[in-house]
Amino acid sequence: MPRQSPPNLAKLIALDLLTVGRVPLLLLVLIFSCAMGVVFMTHHTRQAISAKDQAFMERERLDNEWRNLILEETALAEHSRVQQLARKDLEMKRPDSDKEVVINLK
């Protein structure tokens, strides 16, 4: 009489899962894949929210810089300042009234 080897437990469990336990195995795989999908979507949502917050902060910074540039432009274009720079740096002066020429456009 041939001697029987002891049954392999892992082989029996795998065979049982593939024959009798197909539906529970399929449900287990679906549950794990759904859980991984939730983790994946949560991660990407958090990344998108972080990127949106950074974009808003950059927008605030650029808006402040824009306001400062408008103020600087207004200060630099002030008439009295331009007149003072023309006299001092460029040595310009207002022409005499007899040297002014008026041009009429038709």
From Swiss-Prot:
<dbReference type="InterPro" id="IPR011922">
    <property type="entry name" value="Cell_div_FtsL"/>
</dbReference>
<dbReference type="GO" id="GO:0005886">
    <property type="term" value="C:plasma membrane"/>
</dbReference>
<dbReference type="GO" id="GO:0043093">
    <property type="term" value="P:FtsZ-dependent cytokinesis"/>
</dbReference>
<keyword id="KW-0472">Membrane</keyword>
<feature type="topological domain" description="Periplasmic">
    <location>
        <begin position="44"/>
        <end position="106"/>
    </location>
</feature>
<comment type="similarity">
    <text>Belongs to the FtsL family.</text>
</comment>
<dbReference type="GO" id="GO:0032153">
    <property type="term" value="C:cell division site"/>
</dbReference>
<keyword id="KW-0812">Transmembrane</keyword>
<keyword id="KW-1003">Cell membrane</keyword>
<dbReference type="Pfam" id="PF04999">
    <property type="entry name" value="FtsL"/>
</dbReference>
<feature type="topological domain" description="Cytoplasmic">
    <location>
        <begin position="1"/>
        <end position="22"/>
    </location>
</feature>
<comment type="subunit">
    <text>Part of a complex composed of FtsB, FtsL and FtsQ.</text>
</comment>
<protein>
    <recommendedName>
        <fullName>Cell division protein FtsL</fullName>
    </recommendedName>
</protein>
<comment type="function">
    <text>Essential cell division protein. May link together the upstream cell division proteins, which are predominantly cytoplasmic, with the downstream cell division proteins, which are predominantly periplasmic.</text>
</comment>
<keyword id="KW-1133">Transmembrane helix</keyword>
<keyword id="KW-0132">Cell division</keyword>
<keyword id="KW-0131">Cell cycle</keyword>
<feature type="transmembrane region" description="Helical">
    <location>
        <begin position="23"/>
        <end position="43"/>
    </location>
</feature>
<keyword id="KW-0997">Cell inner membrane</keyword>
